[in-house]
């Protein structure tokens, strides 16, 4: 379950020969969308849907349906903020009370273009989620385990762990505050 950013753990061979092979088996998506940023989610979930940014260096699949902007003026952060709010999650459950999301479910949602979303809030949620995701060994941007990043001024592993726990707790509280603020936009 990854909201805002994450679940990027597949590496796809993307050479010309590999793309030719995928195309010969019907497994290649429309090249118009290659290298484009979008909003994606997992088609099958165990609870609520979690929408997240798909960066331009990531591909999409039928198991990760993706919304792409029609033109450069379309705001993907707005789309992401709307889809991740609790009110829309409830609407999606009413539209399709199952563990699978379909493109038609998203298209059945009302138009929320008048919602006054704070892009900086969504940007911060993505930033925090991306940093969290990249702390996992399955992330292709993973560099080191935070617990083992002792600095010379840290007196003991115990103190370093306490410090990390405080950082993690504060990050969790910030995420919670920002998500609640995003939800309030639709409640008010």
Predicted regions mapped to residue ranges:
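S-adenosyl-L-methionine
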Residues: 4-188
């Amino acid at each position: 379950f990854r909201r805002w950013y994450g679940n990027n753990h597949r590496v796809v061979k993307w050479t010309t020969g590999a793309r030719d092979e995928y195309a010969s088996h019907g497994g290649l998506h429309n090249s118009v969308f290659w290298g484009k940023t979008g909003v994606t989610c997992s088609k099958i979930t165990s609870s609520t849907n979690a929408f997240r940014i798909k960066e331009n260096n990531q591909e999409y699949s039928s198991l990760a349906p993706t919304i792409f902007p029609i033109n450069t003026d379309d705001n993907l952060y707005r789309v992401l903020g709307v889809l991740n709010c609790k009110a829309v999650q409830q609407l999606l459950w009413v539209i399709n009370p199952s563990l699978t999301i379909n493109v038609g479910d998203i298209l059945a949602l009302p138009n929320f273009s008048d919602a006054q979303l704070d892009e900086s809030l969504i940007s911060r949620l993505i930033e925090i989620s991306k940093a969290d995701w990249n702390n996992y060994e399955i992330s292709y941007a993973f560099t080191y385990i935070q617990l083992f990043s002792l600095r010379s001024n840290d007196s003991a592993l115990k103190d370093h762990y306490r410090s990390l726990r405080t950082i993690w707790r504060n990050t969790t509280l910030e995420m919670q505050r920002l998500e609640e603020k995003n939800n309030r936009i639709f409640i008010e």
